[in-house]
């Protein structure tokens, strides 16, 4: 204590000030470690969480369907169900013609070798494709996990087949390149005994959820810290059976990825297009007008399968022009575009899939300014044609046209010019000449170029500033 009448010494004041600053700093650290608000395990609360901005800015991702279904590689990734769940004759005939009598689906497990899986090469390909995020199947409806799940004994990629942690290896390679990592996870497993027991009980019991689904989801989040969880396999049961809201409240409040993680909408019957971080609604969903909620179109280069299949015909492969058109339309309507490939059982991405990805990457390297981090404009497409789609970024408006007009003049009815209007074409030096017509609107003279000098194939971008 100070003696009576002793004055406060400056050194003591400095010490108290230092302690106060340390206390305030610690308080701020605690505050930052906590979410701005706590989300309760109900949809009104969970749906109120703002979507992390990175997802809307990303626009384009690559989807990967890879698992034991890549071994028979015939029909689709639903091979096991089509063969033994529904007993489709063509699948039974395929097994009789190609495999020994008495073969089981489990026999395919050791043949899922991934011997040529080089995650660095995959990551280089996805980066060259222009992908800002990648979503890998950690477990499809067959139940085989592509990581050493502690609750999937002898039916995971560490115990059987590759003897590798496929999820972990790809994540490491992607993050070296600043590509966001998403994990696809199927809630159900077609033939798991506990799931079949719960199904027999009318989903009044939750043996499977407690022993398998929830432990795996928590393990994936804590082990790999994903940027995105792409849930699937929800359709047979309500979200109350899956305990979805309890998991999501933990994910948003207390998980190691609570601030950045994004989820989709497949968390139970009737959740799709109604609840979740963003909406898939259904596979290959295409809205007819601008939705009021963030959404994603997931589609596949192989039109009839998500997994690799040996019976894919060339006519089954989506054309480059269609892929670019779908991307443009999706982004114009405020969505993200998730394009799927299916690697082989050996871990190879077949050349035709690589070619499609690289073609899209080349187009994005020229026109990406109009795609990444863009926002929908007040008009999404020209009503007199479906070949011109709009995006915007700041004060700039981008008109992406899918067909080069024969007369070399692009007609845009929607933009309103001003005294400060400037118009250019991405990757072409200088401003373009333009005029207005009271009946036709804005008329833009496109550059007269030899084919070798045209900056892109299949779609081109006009950048407009100073328009309304």
Swiss-Prot record:
Name of the protein in question: Tissue alpha-L-fucosidase
Keywords, alphabetical: Glycoprotein, Glycosidase, Hydrolase, Lipid metabolism, Lysosome, Phosphoprotein, Signal
Quaternary structure and interacting proteins, as annotated: Homotetramer.
GO-annotated biological processes: fucose metabolic process; glycoside catabolic process; lipid metabolic process
Signal peptide: 1-29
Function statement: Alpha-L-fucosidase is responsible for hydrolyzing the alpha-1,6-linked fucose joined to the reducing-end N-acetylglucosamine of the carbohydrate moieties of glycoproteins.
UniProt site positions, description: May be important for catalysis: 298
UniProt-listed Gene3D superfamilies: Glycosidases (3.20.20.80), Golgi alpha-mannosidase II (2.60.40.1180)
Main location: other
Superkingdom of origin: Eukaryota
An example Gene Ontology molecular-function term: alpha-L-fucosidase activity
Family: Belongs to the glycosyl hydrolase 29 family.
């Amino acid at each position: 204590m100070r003696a009576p009448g002793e004055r406060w010494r400056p050194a003591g004041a400095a010490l108290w000030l230092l302690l106060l600053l340390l206390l305030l700093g610690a308080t701020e650290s605690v505050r930052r470690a906590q979410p701005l608000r706590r989300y309760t395990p109900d949809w009104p609360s969970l749906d109120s969480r703002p979507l992390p901005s990175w997802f809307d800015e990303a626009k384009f991702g690559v989807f990967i369907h890879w698992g034991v279904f890549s071994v028979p590689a015939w029909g689709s990734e639903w091979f096991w169900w089509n063969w033994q769940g529904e007993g489709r004759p063509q699948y039974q005939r395929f097994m009789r013609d190609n495999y020994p009598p008495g073969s089981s689906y489990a026999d395919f497990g050791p043949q899922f070798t991934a011997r040529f899986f080089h995650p660095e090469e995959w990551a280089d390909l996805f980066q060259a494709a222009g992908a800002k995020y990648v979503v890998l199947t950690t477990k499809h409806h067959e139940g085989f996990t592509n990581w050493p799940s502690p609750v999937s004994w002898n039916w995971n990629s560490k115990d059987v087949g590759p003897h590798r942690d496929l999820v972990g290896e790809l994540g490491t390679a992607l993050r070296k390149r600043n590509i966001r990592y998403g994990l696809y996870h199927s809630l159900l497993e077609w033939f798991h005994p506990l799931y079949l027991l719960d199904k027999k009980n009318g989903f009044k019991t939750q043996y499977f959820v407690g022993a398998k689904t929830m432990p795996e989801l928590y393990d994936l989040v804590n082990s790999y810290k994903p940027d995105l969880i792409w849930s699937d396999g929800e359709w047979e049961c309500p979200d109350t059976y899956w305990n979805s809201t309890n998991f999501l409240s933990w994910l948003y409040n207390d998980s190691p990825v609570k601030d950045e993680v994004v989820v989709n909408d497949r968390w139970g019957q009737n959740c799709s297009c109604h609840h979740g971080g963003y909406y898939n609604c259904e596979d290959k969903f295409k809205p007819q007008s601008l939705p009021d909620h963030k959404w994603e179109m997931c589609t596949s280069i192989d039109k009839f399968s998500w997994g690799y299949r040996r019976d894919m015909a060339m006519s089954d492969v989506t054309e480059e022009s269609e892929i670019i058109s779908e991307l443009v339309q999706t982004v114009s309507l405020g969505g993200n575009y998730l394009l799927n490939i299916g690697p082989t059982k050996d871990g190879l991405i077949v050349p035709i899939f690589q070619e499609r990805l690289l073609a899209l990457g080349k187009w994005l390297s020229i026109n990406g300014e109009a795609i990444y981090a863009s926002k929908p404009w007040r008009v999404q497409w020209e009503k007199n044609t479906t070949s011109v789609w709009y995006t915007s970024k700041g004060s700039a408006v981008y008109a992406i046209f899918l067909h080069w007009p024969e007369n070399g003049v692009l007609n845009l009815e929607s933009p309103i010019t001003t005294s400060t209007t400037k118009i250019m074409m991405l990757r072409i030096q200088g401003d373009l000449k333009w005029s207005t017509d009271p009946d036709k609107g804005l008329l833009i003279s496109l550059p007269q170029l030899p084919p070798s000098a045209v900056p892109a194939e299949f779609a081109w971008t006009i950048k407009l500033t100073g328009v309304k």
